């Protein structure tokens, strides 16, 4: 594709964007549907602190398609845009820019100053977001945006929290939760699940000495840094353990029997002492590894506990327990009154209790701890293990699990409501419902919602010194209790507010909400519910539709569901489309640092937004699968789909203007069979699109219209070209124009939600004076049942299947389509044969074959060969496959032909019979010399490849026509321009030209031909003969 084409595509789309803006078309679509049923849509809010990427453009395209379709289908579709403003993404940018990376740096800078800096950068890339949203062709209302940092939004978040609290679904507690040491704050379980990586970590087996010199317990861990906080060991009471003596060291070890070969693969290296049950080990004491907390021994520490979660598939069957750093450890130790110690601060560094490592980052201490254990003869094994480990989704630093005091939403109490809500949601793809999302709901844990951060919605809890709580649910309530005017709810405005009541002083707890709590409250907070627009909010709840990426099954989809189920016992949305991830072409994550993907702007400038939209919509990424992005793929969509459609429009416009066709004067026109076929295909497409869109299956909606463009351009127009060229104003020509006009107008409306630019361009060139101003103001087409002719569509499908079969044979055997052949034999069922009897000439034209023969049996020139399909039949018959192979090899042609017709056969193996069908058999053909054969799903085609002199001469004539018309196109001649030719060629080509002169001149609009005896002009190879032409335009 040349640069001029690329520039024109981009310029044309920019022109359409200007038209939409100048004429306010989006607002007119809303005005046009005022009073119609509302189609409610929730838009997942992005952060404007980062630039939009392909994932955002994909999700935006999906949302745009569904909303445009709903609007054209008669709904009022408000599309408010929202911004996620709070949380770590914003704070992290400010910390980096101001160098506030040390502990306490934000407090020294001032929380008020820090928050105001956050407020300043929230919309850093808002203009870029607006540009990309517009450029991709997406319509949203930027004039009515909602923002999570707005006072009204934050007040509604407070109302949501207060409502949950009133239902007994909020509590304070200490739990082990995912913790980001880089941010110094806990994260939720679903945040921890968003960024797992394959990493190499330490793998150590430690020797814990039983009291009274009774040997050592071996315990395995991948987190040596937690060993300083070891408070207990655990065994499975029902597992069998063994005691052995290491011959080299003389030490006695206890470990799980199943794990023995893993750590002692050489049977000669140890002496067997005996077996013992896990139950017999429970309660025994051991010596602390480190001295830091040995005083806890008096408080039930350093004992062996029972735990039924232990498996012997890895490790030693004995688990080291540091209750502050593992959820299972925490609960097991809590149950047995083992004390909790947590000598790690919020930055992940050891506190003063661990005097030998104080101030050291825990992951950095792994090697030092292992070295010390080795020096003290407490280390049995040291190595590395590769495994999946969670990283912070914002800072990309490793998470730890840490016991913290936090505020929780009691999600487990409402799990049954969430599961019930999920049952009523329509998921696309469907497997997400009970798969990724359903399983996540089944394993849902209480949600840690408090964050030790600054720029967020403050948790509205005020606490007195004696622990009494005041939970505030509105600004009015806070003003009444505090006596102060509230103008902002951020920390630096309300942290100093003290409430005095009943002789007590209440101060706010120092936490803000997890920013996912903000986005989960979005259905209500965007409208300031329940303080304003309550009726509107309730009428639009649950949303008819939402869409985001697969990662949101553990993010926004989840938090929406938690809050909606808890507050209203309903889902937050009825329908959802989940998209996959767009990767770089090499299969890696797209990375600015690696520069492994083209910028979205470059792609849209080069190939247009429609090409990008269609490339994404027609890919597996809309089925929640990963897509390796390829700019060649976008280019291919443009070349193979969009440009042919544009060419179809140009073809219609050229000849309609040439002959003065008026689409209003088309009454009582008798349509040709091919006209009826393309109209039937068109309205069948309308039905398929409507059905697919009702199921929110965009891939299924797009596929048929991409195929229809091929039907229209490469079959209907190509087959009907001479009808449009007819110089006489015949009824047939008017029928062709009328049909093509109807197809292009209706089709522009079908594709409008998906590829809105080319749809608008087509419509503007076709619309009449009284038609709506824009294609997007039109109703989506309805099925016209009387125009749908299934038998005709099936017949044309058969014809095209045969033609494709014939072309594949020509390609396989290097037979040019322009070279005529004498015969083709089409073998099919009797019913198909009768239906196709009248279209032999059409098939002959397409395949460039003189005689088309329809047969019920394979002709004598071909022998049909069958053999077992080993892959499928092997599973069915097992070791009897060789017998079947011999039986099939001996079948006569009559039986094979019967199988070809029926698709089934019975094979006798002695007294036993086995039924076989088409999937059990592979078919091939042995052809006589000069013949080739191939089959499709319904037909066998046999081509007679023998060339006679007349066929050879006609082949040369057709090549001449092709080359002359290529030269016409290269010279950019008008379709009606006449030409004169000077030709230099060998005798055989001159003879072919003379023999087929009338045909050649008619096809190329040539008025005169001169044969010259010297080379001049462009040289061509005509079936192995060197030929040169000079082509000149002549006046009529």
UniProtKB/Swiss-Prot annotation:
Monomer. InterPro entries: aa-tRNA-synth_I_CS, aa-tRNA-synth_Ia, Anticodon_Ile_ABEc, Ile-tRNA-ligase, Ile-tRNA-ligase_type2, M/V/L/I-tRNA-synth_anticd-bd, Rossmann-like_a/b/a_fold, tRNAsynth_Ia_anticodon-bd. SUPFAM superfamilies: Anticodon-binding domain of a subclass of class I aminoacyl-tRNA synthetases, Nucleotidylyl transferase, ValRS/IleRS/LeuRS editing domain. A motif ('HIGH' region) lies at residues 46-56. Its cofactor is Zn(2+). PROSITE patterns: AA_TRNA_LIGASE_I. It is an enzyme of class 6 (ligase). Catalyzes the attachment of isoleucine to tRNA(Ile). As IleRS can inadvertently accommodate and process structurally similar amino acids such as valine, to avoid such errors it has two additional distinct tRNA(Ile)-dependent editing activities. One activity is designated as 'pretransfer' editing and involves the hydrolysis of activated Val-AMP. The other activity is designated 'posttransfer' editing and involves deacylation of mischarged Val-tRNA(Ile). GO terms for molecular function: aminoacyl-tRNA deacylase activity; ATP binding; isoleucine-tRNA ligase activity; tRNA binding; zinc ion binding. Gene3D superfamilies: HUPs, Isoleucyl-tRNA Synthetase, Domain 1. The lineage of its organism: Bacteria, Pseudomonadati, Chlamydiota, Chlamydiia, Chlamydiales. A motif ('KMSKS' region) lies at residues 589-593. It catalyses: tRNA(Ile) + L-isoleucine + ATP = L-isoleucyl-tRNA(Ile) + AMP + diphosphate. IleRS has two distinct active sites: one for aminoacylation and one for editing. The misactivated valine is translocated from the active site to the editing site, which sterically excludes the correctly activated isoleucine. The single editing site contains two valyl binding pockets, one specific for each substrate (Val-AMP or Val-tRNA(Ile)). Its EC number is 6.1.1.5. Pfam families: Anticodon_1, DUF5915, tRNA-synt_1. Keywords: Aminoacyl-tRNA synthetase, ATP-binding, Cytoplasm, Ligase, Metal-binding, Nucleotide-binding, Protein biosynthesis, Zinc. GO terms for cellular component: cytoplasm. This is Isoleucine--tRNA ligase. It is found in: Cytoplasm. Belongs to the class-I aminoacyl-tRNA synthetase family. IleS type 2 subfamily. GO terms for biological process: isoleucyl-tRNA aminoacylation. ATP binds at residue 592.
